[in-house]
Amino acid sequence: MGMRMMFTVFLLVVLATTVVSFTSDRASDGGNAAASDLIALTIKGCCSRPPCALSNPDYCG
């Protein structure tokens, strides 16, 4: 393989790695935010109070 071809393959690998890393990072951001909200509501005791639990059914189940 020539140097130009090896360099092109290297650039493609770097680009593919960057794209996969970027999209997987963005996908996990939503999960992290939801977990943080659930922890905050639980710590504050929201789920034990009926009005709060009714306004947050996604978190209090």
Swiss-Prot record:
Residues found modified as Cysteine amide: C60
Site residues, Direct interaction with nAChR alpha-7 subunit: L54
Organs and tissues of expression: Expressed by the venom duct.
InterPro entries per record: Conotoxin_a-typ (IPR009958), Conotoxin_a-typ_CS (IPR018072)
Cysteine-cysteine disulfides: C46-C52, C47-C60
Keyword DNA-binding: no
Residues spanning the signal sequence: 1-21
Region entry Ser-Xaa-Pro motif, crucial for potent interaction with nAChR, spans: 48-50
GO CC terms: extracellular region; host cell postsynaptic membrane
Residues that make up the propeptide removed upon maturation: 22-44
Domain of life: Eukaryota
A Pfam entry, by short name: Toxin_8
UniProt-recorded Gene Ontology molecular function terms: acetylcholine receptor inhibitor activity; ion channel regulator activity; toxin activity
Keyword presence, Hydrolase: no
Regions annotated as coiled coil: none
UniProt keyword terms in alphabetical order: Acetylcholine receptor inhibiting toxin, Amidation, Disulfide bond, Ion channel impairing toxin, Neurotoxin, Postsynaptic neurotoxin, Secreted, Signal, Sulfation, Toxin
Subcellular location: Secreted
Protein's job: Alpha-conotoxins act on postsynaptic membranes, they bind to the nicotinic acetylcholine receptors (nAChR) and thus inhibit them. This toxin blocks mammalian nAChRs (alpha-7 > alpha-3/beta-2).
Sequence similarity: Belongs to the conotoxin A superfamily.
Record protein name field: Alpha-conotoxin-like PnMGMR-02
Organism: Conus pennaceus (Feathered cone)
